[in-house]
Regions:
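Short alpha-helical segment that forms part of, or immediately flanks, the ligand-binding pocket
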Residues: 153, 175-181, 194
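Conserved catalytic-core segment of nucleotide-activated headgroup transferases in glycan assembly
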Residues: 83-137, 143-149
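Short acidic alpha-helix that forms the nucleotide-activated donor recognition element
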Residues: 148-159, 180
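Acidic donor-binding loop of glycosyltransferase active sites
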Residues: 157-170, 183
Length: 258
């Protein structure tokens, strides 16, 4: 966690504006995260946000949040995938196993993902994240070791389905990574990568019943599985998450502010 009380000692925006005509902030984590700070730190962060010339946010709902909070220009910052540049091997074969998107804490919604993943009657795997808790290894989940992103992407391509019932909406990289490989992913609405790339597999927050229904449909209906697989890959190719589409989008934003 950022040591915010140390930042309070500096005129951060003033110092930055000595170096640049425009100062821009990019969201990291959920938009409500600063509200877990001490009261004086919350006020400091709010005042700091209002001093930026422009903000970038993860999701459409985050754009609305920061626009309302700051009255500053806010744009969506898509997570850019540089898979080809980094040597990611596209999916060409896969096994009968499920990948859930996080550990057993509220932040990741790992327990909800585990419940939904059980519907497939397949081995369940999970990445090891920073919030992994004691005794997780005692569950019938195979935890992968900590990996670089390239190692993660080349490992992910072998899995049948992704399940990511994460209530904390931020950059949405798990669902995005799945879409790159054409892996159907069940998850919550409100996360742009989920809604945009896996529209047939997006459910309302907390709707485990619908998520389990979709899991069984993917399991039993091969045509539905193939539709979800091809759809997410096709939507990824058309999205702002690819370098081809991202570059003109972000260039236009910067040209307008400079």
């Amino acid at each position: 966690k950022t040591n915010v009380d140390k930042l309070l000692q500096f005129d951060m925006i003033g110092d930055l504006k000595k170096l640049s005509k425009k100062v821009i902030s990019m969201q990291e984590g959920p938009h409500w995260f600063f509200q877990d700070y001490k009261m004086e730190e919350q006020i400091w962060w709010y005042n700091t946000l209002t001093e930026f010339d422009m903000l970038f946010a993860h999701n459409k709902k985050d754009v609305k949040y920061y626009e309302g909070l700051t009255n500053k220009p806010v744009h969506k910052m898509p997570t850019l995938m540089l898979a080809e540049r980094l040597g990611i091997i596209p999916r060409n074969e896969w096994g009968d196993a499920i990948m859930i998107g996080g550990n057993m804490v509220r932040w990741y919604g790992g327990f909800d993902s585990y419940v939904v993943a059980q519907e497939f009657d397949m081995p369940i795997y999970a990445p090891s994240m920073g919030r992994k808790i004691d005794r997780e290894d005692e569950m019938d989940i195979t935890h992968l070791p900590y990996m670089t992103w390239v190692e993660w992407m080349n490992n992910l391509r072998q899995y049948h389905v992704g399940v990511h019932m994460m209530p904390t909406h931020a950059a949405g990289t798990f669902t995005l990574n799945c879409a790159y490989h054409g892996i159907p992913c069940i998850g919550y609405r409100g996360l742009d990568t989920q809604e945009e790339l896996h529209p047939l597999l997006s459910v309302d927050d907390g709707d485990i019943e619908e998520a389990k229904y979709l899991a069984n449909k993917l399991k039993e209906d091969e045509d539905f599985y193939q539709e979800c697989s091809s759809t997410c890959r096709e939507l990824y190719e058309k999205s702002l998450y690819t370098e081809e589409n991202f570059v003109p989008y972000i260039t236009g934003i910067f040209e307008n502010i400079l």
